[in-house]
């Protein structure tokens, strides 16, 4: 009898186990949203690539992104968003209001191109030209802002389709002039904030990404706290004494003095700055002087950039630039006038927000495809948003897998190139951050 009971119990257990195996897996609401994001990202990939190629072919410079603004607004019209154009001259702000209580999340993409002739042989390569600082130049999306816009448009399409499953508001910020407004004009993130972007829309947290031509497609890199450098501009005007080119001893040559100053500036970094703390850079990007081969001119002027990742270091380097230029000029009988303009602050990733949202990036890319990197000496005006609300800015891999990092094209060059297969991850990451922000 007891054997009969035992056999019955075994059969019953086997039946229950087999029934469980045959039952479909129950998907919770979070898994459902993640699957929707993955499916919609894949479904919208070709559209996003087409958007990017159009934008790449017709780039516009800072504060002149009128066609770009119209293109973005036109392609957002079919979505369940309200659209404002013209903020900070040519910006676009689209709001997805779910109608349910929840966080107000800002997602930002920059829009402007650069005065660069494109050298990459693409069927959608830029052929745009314009006048810039008195000379004819090409216009190119040589920093990937076309990719950022297309990815954010795709993210807006995905989240609009998921509206019934979301809470709060999502503010899609298409920002002009990240590369810097023309001389005498305001622009970029600073102007958007000045015009009330954060307060008007009630933004509580801000996310942004930047495509990278030197990190592998399918990866995400980030750094907590100081992620990108502060960028300041300087000009040094050297006043000498004009004379005949054959008689330099009868004048004071501002070109030679300028050369000595340029070398002196580099010793500020290599010999006077504790680089074990943070990186720093001083670069002279332009020097102008003279009109003829046989005239030693009266003046020379140089302009350049300063990159720092620490406010104390920033202050010290500013002081040393002034002291170095003035004393070198004085030693040669010349005079140096130094002007330093404060630019973008350090791009600061809120450490609490970064730690909290890291799992979201890992869900999107896979845990092994997300890694911490050292700070970049590049600069970003996303930093202004991160001064107002907690922010997280990360890098999206865009380097083809078959290209070595050393051979990858650099940003701001005629050869800049992006692997478009990385756009899916960009959309997934931004959308995942939205659904995980509570």
Where are these regions (language model features)?
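Histidine/acidic-residue-rich, glycine-tolerant segments that coordinate divalent metal ions
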Residues: 129-140, 146-147, 158-286, 291-295
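Metal-dependent amide/peptide-bond hydrolase catalytic core
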Residues: 25-29, 78, 259-438
């Amino acid at each position: 009898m007891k054997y009969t009971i035992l056999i019955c119990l075994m059969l019953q257990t086997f039946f229950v186990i087999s029934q469980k195996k045959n039952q479909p897996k129950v998907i919770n609401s979070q898994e459902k949203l993640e699957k929707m994001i993955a499916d919609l990202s894949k479904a919208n990939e070709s559209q996003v690539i087409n958007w990017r190629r159009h934008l790449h072919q017709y780039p516009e410079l800072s504060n002149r992104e009128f066609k770009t603004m119209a293109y973005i607004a036109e392609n957002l019209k079919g979505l369940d968003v309200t659209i404002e154009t013209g903020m900070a001259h040519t910006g676009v702000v689209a709001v997805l209001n779910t109608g349910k209580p929840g966080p107000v999340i800002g997602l930002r993409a920059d829009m402007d191109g650069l005065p660069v002739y494109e050298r990459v042989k693409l069927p959608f390569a830029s052929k745009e030209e314009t006048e810039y600082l008195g000379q004819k130049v090409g216009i190119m999306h040589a920093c990937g802002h076309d990719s950022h816009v297309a990815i954010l448009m795709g993210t807006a399409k995905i989240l609009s389709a998921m509206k019934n499953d979301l809470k709060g508001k999502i503010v899609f910020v298409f920002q002009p002039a990240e590369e810097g407004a023309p001389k005498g004009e305001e622009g970029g993130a600073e102007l958007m904030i000045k015009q009330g972007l954060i307060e008007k829309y009630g933004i509580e947290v801000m996310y942004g990404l930047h495509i990278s031509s030197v990190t592998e497609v399918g990866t995400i890199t980030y750094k907590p706290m100081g992620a990108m450098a502060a960028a300041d501009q300087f000009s040094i005007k050297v006043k000498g004494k004009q004379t005949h080119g054959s008689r330099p001893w009868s004048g004071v040559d501002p070109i030679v003095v300028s050369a000595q100053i340029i070398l002196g500036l580099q010793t500020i970094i290599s010999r006077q700055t504790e680089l074990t703390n943070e990186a720093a850079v001083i670069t002279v990007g332009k020097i102008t002087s003279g009109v003829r081969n046989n005239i030693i001119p009266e003046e020379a002027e140089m302009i350049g950039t300063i990159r720092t990742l620490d406010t104390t270091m920033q202050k010290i380097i500013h002081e040393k630039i002034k002291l170095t230029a003035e004393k070198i000029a004085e030693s040669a009988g010349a005079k140096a006038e130094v002007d330093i303009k404060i630019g973008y602050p350090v791009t600061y990733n809120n450490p609490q927000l970064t730690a909290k949202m890291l799992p979201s990036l890992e869900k999107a890319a896979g845990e092994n495809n997300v890694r911490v990197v050292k700070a970049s000496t590049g600069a970003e005006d996303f930093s202004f948003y991160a001064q107002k609300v907690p922010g997280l800015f990360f890098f999206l891999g865009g380097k083809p897998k078959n290209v070595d990092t050393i051979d990858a094209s650099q940003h701001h060059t005629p050869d800049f190139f992006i692997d478009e297969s990385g756009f899916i991850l960009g959309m997934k990451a931004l959308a995942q951050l939205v659904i995980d922000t509570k």
